[in-house]
Structure formats: C-alpha cells, structure tokens
Amino acid sequence: MTRIARDDTRLYNSLMLPPFSVVIPCFNEAARIGATIRATLDYLHKNSPESELIVVNDGSTDATGAIARGIFADAKITTRLLENFPNRGKGAAVRSGLLAAKKPIALFSDADLSTPLEETPKVIEPIANGEVDIAFGSRGLNRRLIGQHQPWRREQAGRIFNLLVRLATDLPFWDTQCGFKAFRMDACRPILEAARIDGFAFDVELLFLAQRAGLRIREIPVRWNHSEGSKVHVIYDSLAMLREVIALRMAS
C-alpha cells in the first residue's frame, strides 16, 4: 500500500483519460442529481468519451429516478440506471453499480460531487498505468485541500472513526470514507462479490478485503468540499458503522 502525501496536479495532465465506468449511488437526491448527472456527462464527453455513467437509484421515494431517466434519454455518453427497491443501503448500491460496470476501471463518486470531477485523473491514471489496483481519494493526507469543511462535530466524528478503523483493522489509511474510489475491475471483482456490508462502513470492508488479498492500494489527497444534505446521522450511523467494523474484524 502506498500513500501520496502531496498534491501535484501536474502529475495528472493527460489530454484524455482511458475508458472507465462512473458509478453514482443515490437515495432521495432529486434536488441535485440532475446537476450532478449533467456535470458528469459533460466531463466524460470532454475527457473520456468512451466511458459510461451508471446511476444506482437506491429505493428513492422522490423523483431521483425520473430525473435520471429524463437526462439519459439525450446523453451522448453510454448511460445506465439501476434501480434497487426497496432501499438496500449505500454499500449495496455501490457494489451493484461496480459489478455492473463494463469498463476495465470503475470509479464510484458520491452524488454531491464533494470531490470535484477534475480530481478524477488522480485515481484513474495510477490504475491505468498498472501501478495499483485501487486508488482512492483522501481528505486526511492534506487537509489544506479541503475547501468547505464539515460541521465541527461531524468532522471530529469522522476523524475518530478513522482512528478506530486503523486500530481495529490494521489498515494504514487516514480516510477510508471519502466517496471517491477507483478499482481495477479484474482484480477487484472477487472482493466486491465477497463483500457483505450494505451500510456506510462498506468502504472499510472493501479496503480490508483488498489488503488481505494482497491488492495494491493507494490513498491520494484530493480537493474536497462539504455539501449540505448528508444522509449520514452523526451519532446513530457512526455507532452502526463501528458495529459493522467490529463484526468485520471478528469475522476475519
């Protein structure tokens, strides 16, 4: 496992990215999914036109699915809408999207685009170049790249959670929860098929299984901005995530 402790955008200045799949899980995101899809399609059209966009509607009770279908009807990029009903959880949504990916590399990104799309080459190119099997964005390696911080309580809870994850799993990473992770699918498909956590701790499970399988993992600092409307409850979901991590450790 390796970590890049600096932000050097000059390293990622290729004119065009190789084809990859983008997976966006969403639950009741009608207020912003339209803008997110349009921005993603525009980015792919300009930087990787052979790529595909997969939106996973995880049992939304609002117009999320209808909005996605409407935009996809005129898309120039290959698109797919997967529907999970009832809601199964973010982990299940991400897994179903990644396992449906048809490109050699797949990236999942949160629906709020807290990590700007312009950071995409940082996680795609190390995989395309054969350096790693998993590359993921991190807020923990260079906090100066955080533009808009989370509320203080939420940010501290996240830092404590990541410390407990390090202690419980021996994972050497400083931010397992940033929603910006890319996978070399031929290497990662077995761990995705083996994963069982459907909740918010799914990231930890994927990294844990990948490390145990000997895959090459790289944590990379990315720009990040907090967006309002998070579905994560600071207390209840943090406790649920800790229970999932403890169960993961005991099962291993």
Task: Describe each PLM feature range.
Residues 29-32, 60, 90, 116:
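Donor nucleotide-sugar binding loop of glycosyltransferases
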Residues 9-19, 163, 170, 194-252:
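Hydrophobic helical membrane-anchoring modules
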Residues 84-100, 105, 117-200, 226-236, ...:
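Acceptor/aglycone-binding surface of glycosyltransferases and processive sugar-polymer synthases
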Residues 36, 64, 94, 118-120, ...:
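Acidic donor-diphosphate engagement hotspot in glycosyltransferases and nucleotidyltransferases
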Residues 29-44:
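Short, well-formed alpha-helical segments that are part of the catalytic scaffolds
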Residues 50-54, 65-100:
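Conserved donor nucleotide-binding strand/loop of the catalytic core
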Residues 57-66, 113:
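A conserved acidic beta->alpha catalytic loop
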